[in-house]
């Protein structure tokens, strides 16, 4: 794993299919993420490969929206998407384990994203990449804990 990718896991006391239904409902992401405030399906879509959704983010210093495309929708196993046509890949993998499901959230900057950040932020691109990387590394454990609480009814 490089500095531009990160994943973390938690065991959730629910079966993979039920947990998949929860994490593939992007409209709930604003409940769990410390940075994403809301998501919605574009054009009335849903969690299927090729479907787009928009996310509204706020890091306390700035607000922005992203457009994402679902790239994996395998019920009970994996749900993943890419942001801005491949700049960053986010996803959840689910694996049955004793006591429920191991839920892993992953994040990875893609080569297109590095290039895109340099085009968008110019001389501030590297600083922005560090900021986004830190946000992912700090936010993923928080998001996983919140999903676990929701899924387990807490």
Residue ranges and their predicted role:
Residues 18-23, 29, 53, 70, ...:
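Hydrophobic pocket/interface hotspot
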Residues 1-43:
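Hydrophobic ligand-binding cavity/cleft-lining segments
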Residues 1-11, 134-141, 153-154:
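Hydrophobic-ligand-binding modules of eukaryotic lipid transfer/binding families
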Residues 41, 142-154:
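Short, highly charged C-terminal tails/helix-capping segments
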Residues 51-58, 78-85:
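Short beta-strand segments that buttress and anchor functional surface loops
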């Amino acid at each position: 794993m490089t500095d531009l990718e990160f994943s973390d896991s938690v065991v959730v006391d629910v079966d993979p299919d039920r947990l998949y239904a929860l994490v593939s409902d992007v409209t709930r992401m604003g409940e769990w993420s410390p940075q994403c405030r809301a998501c919605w399906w574009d054009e009335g879509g849903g969690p299927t490969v090729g479907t787009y959704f928009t996310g509204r983010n706020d890091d306390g210093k700035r607000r922005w929206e992203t457009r994402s495309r679902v790239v994996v929708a395998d019920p009970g196993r994996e749900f993943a998407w890419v942001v801005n046509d491949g700049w960053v890949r986010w996803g959840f993998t689910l694996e049955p384990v004793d006591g429920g499901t191991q839920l892993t959230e992953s994040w990875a900057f893609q080569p297109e994203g590095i290039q895109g950040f340099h085009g968008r932020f110019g001389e501030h691109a590297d600083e922005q990449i560090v900021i986004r990387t830190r946000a992912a590394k700090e936010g993923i454990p928080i998001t996983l804990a919140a999903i676990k609480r929701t899924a387990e009814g807490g």
